[in-house]
A protein has these predicted regions:
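A sensor for short, sequence-defined functional sites
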Residues: 1-335
Length: 335
């Protein structure tokens, strides 16, 4: 950088490359140059990453992005700093965020739109079998898109290839130190994030997974046992608080879909079925736990509709998330 006097001034592209500048404004400036070379109308914009900007003339900015003019005359924000290895052009970790475009006609403060939960789905489909000794064997497939994809794929795009399998194994070991990863399939080239949403399939066995009593067992559904909790940022929000006076934030809007079947040992039955359904402007939840023949079927669908919530959204958000968390309680099966 220039040192003293650097400020918010964008350098020209030649200086960015000859001086090897590399902060956000230099990355955004380079993108603007490339877009203009392609015949598009593009300009810089300022924002405050992760926070709001007050509607007063003051320095409330810490991040430089770009805007490009579309055929309908509107401007689309682009963030080349945040979207490498992400399947978006504007990071939805910055949704509902203020920005100020530096366009010739002038502009008031703008705000980025909400991204629909299904743009950031996180899905696990698991098929498991429990034996009479409490050992669980099975297979699950994980798929994700948007910000959920970015989080899960990070080990492949920025990590050492020699660590890939260890990272997969650590997900199972977080469930039980006895867990064994038998096989994992992360597709042909998981680093190619632009090809398709991430998909990983695990095969495993976990001895002593269930707690055994006299003609009964207790177990937590595998899909609620800590798998990829780093993606589920909503779990880090304290939903024991009954009321909030102020707004709150999550990492991103998100759709979580968890489906699991558990084949039971001969003669065992699920003690109690569960069904729940919650809807609100902030979040929705639907789910059930029930037995069909000798299998337990578990289904959950949690839709978190925003990144930035108002205090009035708390009851709907809290109710949906707590209903989802309750599906992580122990299931009791007996003869």
């Amino acid at each position: 950088t220039m040192g003293k006097g650097e400020g918010f001034t964008l350098h020209n592209t030649k200086m960015n490359y000859t001086d090897r500048c590399g902060v956000c404004k230099d990355i955004a400036g380079s993108l603007i140059s490339f877009l203009r070379m392609a015949g598009l109308e593009a300009y810089p914009a300022m924002t405050m990453a992760g926070s709001r900007v007050e509607s007063i003339p003051a320095d409330h900015f810490n991040h430089c992005v770009a805007v490009v003019k579309l055929s309908n005359g509107t401007y689309m924000p682009l963030d080349p700093t945040w979207v490498p290895f992400c399947r978006e052009l504007w990071s939805s970790a910055e949704q509902q965020q203020n920005y100020l475009p530096g366009v010739p006609e002038g502009s008031d403060l703008c705000i980025t739109p909400v991204s629909a939960p299904e743009n950031h789905y996180f899905r696990i489909k698991a098929n498991n079998k429990l034996d009479k000794n409490g050992k669980l064997t099975g297979q699950f497939t994980l798929t994700a898109e948007g910000q959920s994809d970015l989080n899960i794929r990070r080990i492949f795009t920025t990590g050492w290839q020699s660590d890939w399998k260890n990272s997969m194994e650590s997900q199972l070991l977080s469930i039980s130190p006895k867990a064994k990863l038998l096989k994992v399939d992360w597709s042909k080239n998981p680093k190619d994030y632009q090809a398709a949403p991430i998909k990983i399939t695990f095969w495993y066995e976990i001895p002593d997974y269930a707690i055994i009593g006299n003609d009964e067992m207790a177990l937590v559904p595998l899909t609620m046992h800590g798998l990829y909790d780093q993606v589920r940022s909503y779990l880090r929000i304290d939903t024991d608080i009954p009321e909030r006076q102020y707004g709150f934030k999550d990492g991103c809007s998100r759709l979580v879909e968890l489906d699991e079947t558990i084949q039971l040992p001969q003669g065992y039955r699920l003690v109690q079925s569960v069904e729940d359904n919650r809807k609100s402007p902030a979040a929705d939840f639907e789910g059930y736990i029930r037995q069909e023949n000798n299998k337990i079927d578990i289904h959950q669908k949690l839709a978190l509709k925003k990144r930035v919530y108002e205090a009035g959204d708390w009851n709907g958000f809290r109710t949906a998330v707590n209903a989802h968390k309750a599906f992580g309680n122990h299931l009791i099966i007996n003869k």
